[in-house]
A protein has these predicted regions:
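Immediate N-terminus of the mature polypeptide
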Residues: 1-21, 162, 182
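Charged/polar positions within long, soluble alpha-helices
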Residues: 17, 77-80, 135
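Membrane interface segments of multi-pass transport proteins and intramembrane proteases
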Residues: 15-33
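A structured, mid-to-C-terminal "fold-capping" secondary-structure block
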Residues: 102-186
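Mid-length scaffold segments of soluble, non-membrane domains
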Residues: 37, 41-121
Length: 186
């Protein structure tokens, strides 16, 4: 089943994501950097509660200051002045938090579009959706659990993050695909 979903994801990447990412890479560097900064800044909102749950209070504090600085001085996070001040924030999610509490990774499988994961990380993704302040703020109250209840701004930010990541890794993915005997096993 996972190989079949992996093949579907490869087709999705080849037909949609890779061509969009290659066009995205033609944009001026400042736009791409700003997009990456913006989506990373939004993702910081999810890292903060996970740092707290992990007992990493210094990291939570740094992430909070980074978000505040980048959202104001960095104009909604398109700039990253916090980095110049020494704030480097790593991403944390609920799957990692569960791992710090001793929850094992569990079985490996591949999700459509989202890609490879483990049972723990899949549960973490669901929890992250509920913990993500940006998701909560942009979802319609009456349709909280339905994708159709999602506002386009939330979906657009997630899609921009995926395109930015894919754009940054076009060469790496092409090399991996070209040099792998079995891409699924890679």
């Amino acid at each position: 089943v996972s190989r079949g979903i992996f093949s579907f994801n490869q087709g999705f990447d080849r037909i949609i994501l890779e061509p969009v990412a290659k066009q995205y890479n033609k944009l001026p560097e400042k736009i791409k950097t700003g997009t990456g900064n913006f989506t990373s800044n939004i993702a910081t909102l999810l890292s903060i509660p996970n740092f707290v749950l992990q007992g990493e209070f210094k990291q939570a504090s740094d992430a909070t200051f980074s978000f505040a600085i980048n959202s104001t001085v960095g104009i909604l996070g398109f700039g990253n002045p916090a980095r110049a001040l020494g704030f480097e924030v790593q991403k944390e999610d609920l799957g990692q938090t569960l791992g710090t509490y001793g929850v094992k990774g569990g079985c490996y499988f591949v999700l459509p579009i989202l890609g490879p994961t483990t049972a723990r990380d899949a549960i973490g993704m669901i929890g992250d959706t509920f913990m993500d302040p940006f998701a909560t703020a942009t979802w319609r109250e009456k349709e909280f659990l339905s994708v159709s209840g999602s506002r386009p701004d939330y979906i657009a930010v997630k899609a921009a993050g995926a395109v930015d990541f894919r754009g940054d890794n076009v060469v790496n993915f092409d090399s991996l695909e070209k040099n792998s005997i079995d891409l699924y096993a890679s």
